[in-house]
């Protein structure tokens, strides 16, 4: 699961850098093919308690800790909110569109929703089908689940039905 990202300023002492914080759960690492190189991913308990902990990408580490090699255990601030670093992601470099995949911060989705976005609902979900062939089936199942959760009426012979109030994007 991933929540909506929020961009802002990350601060460590006199060092600061603009970046994006993503509210996620542990499955996000698998879905996005990310690995924790140092430290660890935050726990289920961190999610349940909306803990102010995070896992950071190498670009964020380089910008906030230019003279230190191990930021695990250190506290950084997102705008004014402190987050303790529990892990550092293995570097992925730039993607084919020229975006720095190491310029990110991951935190428990519950903490981002509560402490940053001040919302009580999930804005975004990331999923991964086991194989490319299962993508359509997964999309259909996700659509069915979301329509049910959002209490949207299906079309019948004499009723048009409710439009989806969500979007599903597919990346292969």
Predicted regions and their residues:
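Short, well-ordered secondary-structure micro-motifs
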Residues: 11-13, 96-98, 172
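Residue-level detector of beta-strand face positions
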Residues: 9, 73-77, 167
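Mid-to-C-terminal secondary-structure elements
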Residues: 22, 26-42, 51-155
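Short amphipathic beta-strand/extended segments in non-transmembrane regions
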Residues: 1-42, 168
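Exposed loop/turn and edge beta-strand positions of beta-sandwich/beta-sheet ligand-binding modules
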Residues: 15, 50, 103, 162-164
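Peri-transmembrane interface segments
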Residues: 142, 155-172
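Short linear capping/connector segments at secondary-structure termini
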Residues: 3-7, 47, 126, 162-165, ...
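Short amphipathic alpha-helical segments
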Residues: 17, 121-125, 164
């Amino acid at each position: 699961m991933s929540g909506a990202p929020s961009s802002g300023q990350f601060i460590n002492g006199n060092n600061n850098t603009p970046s994006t914080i993503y509210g996620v759960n542990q499955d996000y690492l698998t879905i996005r093919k990310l690995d924790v190189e140092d430290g660890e991913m935050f726990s289920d308990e961190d999610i349940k308690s909306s803990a102010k902990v995070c896992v950071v990408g190498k670009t964020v580490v380089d910008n906030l800790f230019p003279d230190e090699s191990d930021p695990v255990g250190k506290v950084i601030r997102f705008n004014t909110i402190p987050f303790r670093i529990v892990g550092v992601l293995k570097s992925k470099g730039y993607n084919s569109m020229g975006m720095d995949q190491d310029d990110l911060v991951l935190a428990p989705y519950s903490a981002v929703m509560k402490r940053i976005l001040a919302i009580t609902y999930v804005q975004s979900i990331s999923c991964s089908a086991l194989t490319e062939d299962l993508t359509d089936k997964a999309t259909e199942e996700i659509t069915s689940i979301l329509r049910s959760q959002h209490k949207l009426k299906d079309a019948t012979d004499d009723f048009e039905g409710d439009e989806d109030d969500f979007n599903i994007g597919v990346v292969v």
